[in-house]
Amino acid sequence: SGGFDFSFLPQPPQEKAGVGLGPGPMGLMGPRGPPGASGAPGPQGFQGPAGEPGEPGQTGPAGARGPAGPPGKAGPGKPGRPGERGVVGPQGARGFPGTPGLPGFKGIRGGQTGARGLPGERGRVGAPGPAGARGSDGSVGPVGPAGPIGSAGPPGFPGAPGPKGELGPVGNTGPGPAGPRGEQGLPGVSGPVGPPGNPGANGLTGAKGAAGLPGVAGAPGLPGPRGIPGPVGASGATGARGLVGEPGPAGSKGESGGKGEPGSAGPQGPPGSSGEEGKRGPNGGSTGPTGPPGLRGGPGSRGLPGADGRAGVIGPAGARGASGPAGVRGPSGDTGRPGEPGLMGARGLPGSPGNVGPAGKEGPAGLPGIDGRPGPIGPAGARGEAGNIGFPGPKGPAGDPGKGAPGPDGNNGAQGPPGLQGVQGGKGTTGEAGKPGERGPGEFGLPGPAGPRGERGPPGESGAVGPSGAIGSRGPSGPPGPDGNKGEPGVVGAPGTAGPAGSGGPGERGAAGIPGGKGEKGETGLRGEVGTTGRDGARGAPGAVGAPGPAGATGDRGEAGAAGPAGPAGPRGSPGERGEVGPAGPNGFAGPAGAAGQPGAKGERGTKGPKGENGIVGPTGPVGSAGPAGPNGPAGPAGSRGDGGPPGVTGFPGAAGRTGPPGPSGITGPPGPPGAAGKEGLRGPRGDQGPVGRTGETGAGGPPGFTGEKGPSGEPGTAGPPGTAGPQGLLGAPGILGLPGSRGERGLPGVAGAVGEPGPLGIGPPGARGPSGAGKHGNRGEPGPVGSVGPVGALGPRGPSGPQGIRGDKGEPGEKGPRGLPGLGLPGLAGQHGDQGPGPVGPAGPRGPAGPSGPPGKDGRTGHPGAVGPAGIRGSQGSQGPSGPPGPPGPPGPPGASGGGYDFGYEGDFYRA
């Protein structure tokens, strides 16, 4: 009886003599015992066959780019006003995409991923044109017309990257419609990582600000851009030369422009080397009395940098004072401190995609990493095909009738084959841009080498000194007058006392520029290799016991299996309500007697009366408390099965048992027909902002294109046979920058071609991209019946890839599958950083060491235009000297302190100026 105490049942009357009365009627069924221990795990099942590969997507065509036009000719001119600032050269053509890789043949455990395609050659970025010669006072020479766009030459094989070309002439970017966006192509065969592309060309250096008034060296420099005017002091020493940005070619000398908006003040530097004579600016207040000519002073010591003050509002210009005699030229002061790096220029047009590196070999499985923060939930993938039905297991032992407490959790079943990959979900909404970073102390780019120093003009005659007039009330600023002739330097006056330093400081932040148009969407990167399956994580704490579900329908009674070992007896439950007596079953055979239980306390023996007639059986007395259970006797032969009694009262649910070790996988059956697609899931929350990537090199900025109208969808074209890969084409000239077209409608899916025998992996030069089919994407066909799975054949040579089927409509997302084990993939190769957008091109910083590979970034948002620099000081009127030959480029300046600029975020990319 399984170790249960049946002493509470009515016992047959005991005979005084040792004569048995034979087997009595069957007793009532006792209460349900505790659940037995879990059985040993079953044997491991066989791996099921792999599912059929999905249909490949269709590749759209890439437009060919024409060759570059001939350079425009610069107009001749006498020395004089500067030429127009050159437009930044067009962006180099995008390299041809690599040949698509043939999808790997999926073996029993998922075949190896096909190797990636050879990378297209990276287009070269157009370099800025050389600086124009110094123009005359006459008009600017006309810019030559752009040459005609040549037709594209026949494609050639990719050559090794050539040497960095000379700075080419500047072309104009013209508008033009963009071609339709191609469909996503098959992943290409991965080639080796190409050499890094040439850095983007530096922008032209702006016109040089005029130098400060010459003074005796050694006194503190003039403050940077004007703050609130302090009391007028004697002329200070020359202010520190502004740091020159990363050198482009030397710009032509700019004419004195109108007064610019005040820029943010940089920290006051120590006196710089004396600059070339600048044009004289308006005097703030009347000049002090002229001192006697001073002796040539020695070099002054470096002053401490002044604290940054906020830029003051510019007051109206004061009346112009009389010119004092020019002093003797003092010795050069110490070199000023480097300025702070400037704001990042606006983002350029997207560059061509970088070369895809070769697929790495699978590394050893790493230790499981710390759980990352959950990313955004993507759209649910399409529902995978139903797994195979496992073989039926042996029938379990017949359960006791009645509703017992729930048993322990069963072992996890074998994991089914992975479902088909779901269609990619729509693009997430753009997150909010990150708030601007803390403002750094300065607003200039890293210093580059100084441009060539201009020649000094012949000295002019010194004007007579007039008496100091009374300080008039300050009138409003008049319009800037015409450029005066350059005066000859006069004799240096005696050093005046240094006026108090004005409170410099950063100016108000300029208004944010209009963000440029959205860059073109980068090519979709190749899918990384499947990472090795991670180990199981630590078991979580058991969850709370759920409310018991409704009782299921009673299943058919299984055949009795072999009895498992008896579990330890649980605590004695309270006896259930007594059920009604069922009909007596047929008498079973008496088993061998069990060990006798402990006898109850013997009652007192009554006096033996005369044996009377058998009287009426009295009512059964109350059940005595049960003695402890004796050890189980050996089991007797099984009696015939009695009918089940009525179900007992449902007990309380037991605590959840611990999950046993997972059993081996069962044999995977053939895949069932695919289920219906589920409904589209809700879009998940936006993921956390990723870490800041390192700033890419500044690209040449073109104007942003406008988004074109969405074109009508075409009818689906039939897939053509795959073309042979053509030789790598020569880089065509940059075409006219088109307006990006909108994405076409999806077409009907084509019939998937039969999977060919996989051929050997060819490494051909990438072919040219064919024209896109005009078709509309069709609806997905009904899945055919699933055939029986044949034995896995030997891996044959790889055949040519079949024609690409048309991409089907996005199916309804399937239900979310069970959570997989965490993968341990190798870190992906870094995606090519997008070029930066239009805006003033800042100087390129020195190239830092390569950081760790990050995930491919999305295109960043167009940066804000940089702040307008301060206007130069107006020079005195003098005659113009002849232009001298350009001097050699100066040495590069020391690197500036790292400034904090704005942070721009766009769709997960983060740029720091």
Swiss-Prot record:
Residues 602-611, 807-818 have a biased composition (Basic and acidic residues). The keyword Protein biosynthesis does not apply. Prolines at the third position of the tripeptide repeating unit (G-X-Y) are hydroxylated in some or all of the chains. Keywords: Extinct organism protein, Extracellular matrix, Hydroxylation, Secreted. Residues 883-895 have a biased composition (Pro residues). It is found in: Secreted; Secreted, Extracellular space; Secreted, Extracellular space, Extracellular matrix. Residues 254-263, 281-303, 422-431, 499-517, 639-648, 696-705, 759-776 have a biased composition (Gly residues). Its main location: secreted. GO terms for biological process: extracellular matrix organization. One of its GO terms (molecular function) is extracellular matrix structural constituent conferring tensile strength. The modification 4-hydroxyproline is found at residues 10, 13, 35, 41, 338, 341. One of its GO terms (cellular component) is extracellular matrix. It comes from the Eukaryota. InterPro entries: Collagen (IPR008160), Collagen_superfamily (IPR050149). Expressed in bones. Residues 1-913 are annotated as: Disordered. Residues 28-67, 125-154, 199-220, 264-274, 316-332, 367-386, 408-421, 459-476, 488-498, 527-574, 581-601, 619-629, 650-659, 713-740, 748-758, 782-797 have a biased composition (Low complexity). PANTHER family: COL_CUTICLE_N DOMAIN-CONTAINING PROTEIN-RELATED (PTHR24023:SF1112), COLLAGEN ALPHA (PTHR24023). These protein fragments were extracted from an ancient humerus epiphysis bone collected in Haiti. Trimers of one alpha 2(I) and two alpha 1(I) chains. Interacts (via C-terminus) with TMEM131 (via PapD-L domain); the interaction is direct and is involved in assembly and TRAPPIII ER-to-Golgi transport complex-dependent secretion of collagen. Type I collagen is a member of group I collagen (fibrillar forming collagen). Belongs to the fibrillar collagen family. This is Collagen alpha-2(I) chain. It comes from Parocnus serus (Greater Haitian ground sloth). The lineage of its organism: Eukaryota, Metazoa, Chordata, Craniata, Vertebrata.
